[in-house]
C-alpha cells in the first residue's frame, strides 16, 4: 500500500526557467507536468486510497499551482485538503539583500545587480511539511524546498521526530536524497556503466528503508 507519493521537480536552472514563465504570465511558474502527469490522471485513486501527495512542484508560484489542484478537486466533487508552504520567495527583499554586499562562498563573486535577477529563493525545510500533514492536509505543495524535504517531512510526521532527533533526521535526509536522485543512485552516474550493464534504458530505481 502506498501512503505517500513524493516528487521533486526543482533545480537552480529550473527555478530560472519558471521565473521567466511567471514573468510572461503571472499564472505560470510551477511544474505543469505535476498537474498533467500526476494529479489529473490519478486524482480519483489518490482520494480512494488516501495517498498523501508531497511535492515542491510549486516552483516560484506555489499558490497558482495549488489553485489549479483545488479546482480539479472541486470539479471531481472530492473532499481533499490542499496545503501550500510559502516563505522561500525573497524577491521582495532584493533591495535589502543587494545592500548587504554578499559574496559567493567559493568564487567571492559579488551579489548580482538586482536588475539581472529573476528570482531569489531560500531553501525550505521538512518541518513545515510535517506540520501540514499533522493538520490533515492531503496534497502539500511547496516552493523551493530542500530536495530531501519531501521525504523527510513524511518521516518526521510518521515517526514523530523532533528537531533534537538529529540521528533520525540525518537518516531521513539521506533516504530523501537517494530517492530524489532516482536512477542516478542506481548507476545513472556511473562512468563505466557499459562494463556492468547492457544499457541505461531500464536500470531500476533505488529503495530506501527508514
Residue ranges and their predicted role:
Residues 53-54, 58, 140-141, 145, ...:
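Long, contiguous hydrophobic alpha-helical segments, chiefly transmembrane helices and signal peptides
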Residues 130-164:
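Charge-patterned, long linear interaction tracts outside catalytic cores
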Residues 37-47, 116-133, 168-210:
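Polyanion-binding loop/helix "lid" in catalytic or ligand-binding cores
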Residues 10-12, 146-147, 185:
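Short, glycine-/Ser/Thr-/acidic-enriched flexible segments
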Residues 1-97, 109-123, 128, 134, ...:
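Metallocofactor- and cofactor-centric catalytic cores in central/energy metabolism, strongly enriched
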Amino acid at each position: 500500500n502506498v501512503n505517500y507519493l513524493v516528487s521533486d521537480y526543482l533545480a537552480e536552472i529550473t527555478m530560472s526557467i519558471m521565473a521567466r514563465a511567471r514573468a510572461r504570465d503571472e499564472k505560470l511558474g510551477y511544474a505543469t507536468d505535476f498537474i498533467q502527469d500526476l494529479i489529473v490522471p490519478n486524482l480519483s485513486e489518490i482520494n480512494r486510497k488516501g495517498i498523501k501527495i508531497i511535492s515542491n512542484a510549486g516552483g516560484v508560484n506555489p499558490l497558482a499551482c495549488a489553485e489549479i489542484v483545488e479546482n480539479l478537486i472541486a470539479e471531481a466533487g472530492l473532499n481533499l485538503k490542499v496545503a501550500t508552504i510559502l516563505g522561500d520567495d525573497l524577491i521582495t527583499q532584493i533591495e535589502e539583500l543587494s545592500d548587504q554586499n554578499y559574496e559567493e562562498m567559493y568564487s567571492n563573486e559579488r551579489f548580482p545587480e538586482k536588475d539581472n535577477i529573476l528570482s531569489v529563493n531560500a531553501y525550505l525545510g521538512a518541518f513545515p511539511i510535517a506540520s501540514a500533514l499533522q493538520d490533515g492536509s492531503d496534497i502539500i505543495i511547496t516552493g523551493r524546498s530542500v530536495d530531501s524535504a519531501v521525504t523527510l517531512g513524511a518521516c518526521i510526521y510518521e515517526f514523530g521526530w523532533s528537531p533534537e532527533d538529529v540521528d533520525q533526521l540525518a537518516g531521513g535526509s539521506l533516504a530523501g536524497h537517494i530517492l530524489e536522485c532516482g536512477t542516478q543512485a542506481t548507476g545513472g552516474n556511473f562512468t563505466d556503466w557499459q562494463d556492468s550493464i547492457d544499457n541505461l534504458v531500464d536500470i531500476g530505481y533505488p529503495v530506501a528503508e527508514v
